Amino acid sequence: MADKGCEAAQSKDSSAPGSGEPRPKTEKELERERQKAAKLEKYHAKLAAKKAKEEARKPKLDKKAKIASPVAEYVEKTTPGEKKVLQDLDSPALKSYNPKAVESAWYDWWVKSGFFEPEFGPDGKPKKEGVFVITSPPPNVTGALHIGHALTIAIQDSLARWNRMLGKTVLFLGGFDHAGLSTQSVVEKKLWYTQKKTRHDYPRDKFVDIVWEWKEEYHNRIKNQMSRLGGSFDWTREAFTMDENLSRAVVETFVRLHEENIIYRANRLVNWCTALQTTLSNLEVENVDVPGRTLLKVPGYDEPVEVGVLTSIAYAVEGSDERIVIATTRPETLLGDTAVAVHPQDPRYKHLHGKFVKHPFCNRSIPIICDDIIVDMEFGTGAVKITPAHDPNDYEVGKRHNLEFINIFTDDGLLNENCGEFAGMKRFTARVKVVERLKELGLFVGTKENPMVIPLCGKTSDIIEPVMKPQWWVNQKEMAAAAAEVVKSGEIEIAPDMSRREFIRWMENIQDWCISRQLWWGHRIPAYFVNLADEPSQDRSEGRYWVTGRTLEQAEEKAKAAFPGKSFTLEQDEDVLDTWFSSGLWPFSTLGWPKDTSDYENFYPTTLMETGWDILFFWIARMVMLGLKLTGKIPFKRVFCHALVRDAQGRKMSKSLGNVVDPIDVIEGISLQALHDKLLVGNLDSREVEKAKKGQRLSYPKGIPQCGTDALRFTLCSLTTGGRDLNLDILRVEGYRKFCNKLYNATKFALGRLGSNFVPNKTADLTGNESLVEKWIFHRLNIAAAAMNKNMEEMNFLQATSAVHQFWLYELCDVYIENSKYLLSDGTEVQQESAKQTLYTVLDNALRLMHPFMPYVTEEMWQRLPRRPGDKTQTIVKAAFPVERVDYSNEIAAKYYESIITVVHSTRSMMAENGIKSDAVVYIHPDEEHSKLITSESASIQSLIKKCKTLSIVDNTFDSDKCVKNEVLEGSTIFLERNN
């Protein structure tokens, strides 16, 4: 695609160059010729590559390998926070593109100067150009950022910078999430790994202090990474989910929703992680398919645990010799069985309706019940064991038939006092022992492989146990219906459409949300149990004896009203809230809600929420529901869900695979050995470290080269297509680093040609002295500007990056700069001045076009360009973004010049095909239609061909015996003199 962006006015020139105007080619004809020339050039390039490969295979005779000179060390001379002191581009460290040198010092100056803070109009209100607000997804304070965070920042920051350059009032608000479960999990792992201690070895307040210390360390580390990535966050508004105001918002939300009976307390089946000893929401559970008998590594067990096996056992029917055979994948749960269910219409069991079976281990009788919902007569034996306290389906059966709910597990995964001889055993040890005892009793029938789904904790990989626990819940039904409606109506746009459809489907099938967690790190639930002095036995599982309050005093007033005249004490719930509860308030709590602040007035609803599709339900859904419920407004107008980053082979990034990419390693470069060394700092055990090292050797055999921030950002944006996955190949990042070098050197060349005394015109308007190539480059700049703005608005990052890359590489560098060389050296004084002014204008605009994706190199080179008289713009951050200009559009001149490019490409292809690498002798016999054009632009053609010794225009009497020839433009002929 072409690039876009410019700001100048130029009179349209519809006349053809030279006299006797030739008929301009139609776009269709030109495109056909371009395709033909491009195919030919590609074919010859392929041949040349093949030849080079063959040459490379030949043995080298006594040739020493060329060793690249090391880059000189760059020493920054700028005082931190001050405007960068620009060093000479001819100094050793700056002779070629050096990311370290280019990226140094700019960010601190941008922040200190307030360039990232919202700019308001003279009246203190947002500017008339509009408002753009992103409250960026807060990274967890669990460790360093990974490449997925880099993708998020690259996309969001490109949009923030683009909108800022359009003159809008922009707020790009960043912050951090306390991430209760994730952070506590990683801190506990660290304590165990380094000291063999758990949180229970500390008083709660001491453990929380340890987590705060972790938070401070990683908060600072992550903030530095976010800055290194160029994120133009307004750090004066930085937020943390446990800040005072955000904590106030959490309390307000909980109390308000509890008062409306949307939040309630109930004893229900929950997902229990024995490793963390906390409940998890369904979204925090990873359901893993196993094809059959499988061994899984489970926390707390030295040996792998067997899953994917169906065990058949027999229950003896009381008062007879009959047996009922049932099957289970969890034999240990036999100890919690309180019924055996059969289908009421199953003739095999009709005579057993109302009978009992004898429990083999516990001294109790178990009823045989009829249930046509859970039992399928055609499956297995047609009999099903019912364990209401430990299975979601059985839980419903238990409620329907008023069965006893017997819990068999302790919080840490041992069998409890209800399990007789198995009490105190680990649950999976008990699984084996139960089967052994059944064999001894003659009740074991057999086993077979069974494909199944195993629920695992997303943090610990522990196997989840469904258990009965009193918890706090959110009834989401009405909120979800409202959320679905604003998306269906288009009030909130969600892209891509797949994510929109998934959002609506999820909202229409919403379940209640368990929001309490048995953790110590997080927002403690503002609910208080009312201990009544005259009622020693009170039920804590339901909500009757619980009150909530924004303060302890408010809770006391509620307790007095609920229990008038009673003596009581209040005891605050020790549980904390699910992290996503506070995260769901992010778009408005960060702006001051529940207070009515100026930020809330100016910036809410926000403009865009951009994040990975994987947290659509975790986060986006909850922000929409809570935003509508609490503020009466949508939290944002648009949602864009980007892909998940995978490695070059398409694998999920995982520490144990050794393919996790730290963006700083890509920016700075890192050796393979240093990558290995980093593995030793984490919580991986020795086996996992060796596996990860193997993965690193596969993915990064030579380490990761230094690529710089700009190349990384550009790569990530260029790979963003709206798909589900994004495969990142470090070689591609390295390729865009070379593109940065091209941009850097092109600007260096331009600065050299402009000279130190060059003064740009007061405006970017055309002068009327422009040559054909200048008219063409302005036209292409116009197309690039239009394409860039259109695609950024549509968040089509693939096309936006393609547009600016196309313009820089193939139009500005490969064509205009090459073509302008002869104008700058051999043209008349008027031609030289015009070429310089055009070079300046186009380069200035091209740098601005690239700035949203590559902030550092564009600022570095833009600051070296002179400013127009009267232009006081301090930084490219605040420079006007190029927009389409009618006066730069020149279709006729563009078509003429495309004909010139076609001739050039065809000639280059002929040279490649005939092995002519330099001193080419070229003759062109133009047809009548193109004669004036080719003759007048012969110098341009020769300049663009490169390695062309002479170029002559000939007529039909030319003796071509010594030449190869090729027809172009449907009538013109190129002759290339053969090598002797």
Curated annotation (Swiss-Prot):
Residues 1-40 are annotated as: Disordered. Keywords: Aminoacyl-tRNA synthetase, ATP-binding, Cytoplasm, Ligase, Nucleotide-binding, Protein biosynthesis. One of its GO terms (biological process) is cytoplasmic translation. A motif ('KMSKS' region) lies at residues 652-656. Its main location: cytoplasm. CDD domains: Anticodon_Ia_Val, ValRS_core. The keyword Cytoplasm applies. A motif ('HIGH' region) lies at residues 139-149. It catalyses: tRNA(Val) + L-valine + ATP = L-valyl-tRNA(Val) + AMP + diphosphate. Its EC number is 6.1.1.9. GO terms for cellular component: cytoplasm; cytosol. Residues 22-40 have a biased composition (Basic and acidic residues). PANTHER family: VALINE--TRNA LIGASE, VALYL-TRNA SYNTHETASES. Belongs to the class-I aminoacyl-tRNA synthetase family. This is Valine--tRNA ligase.
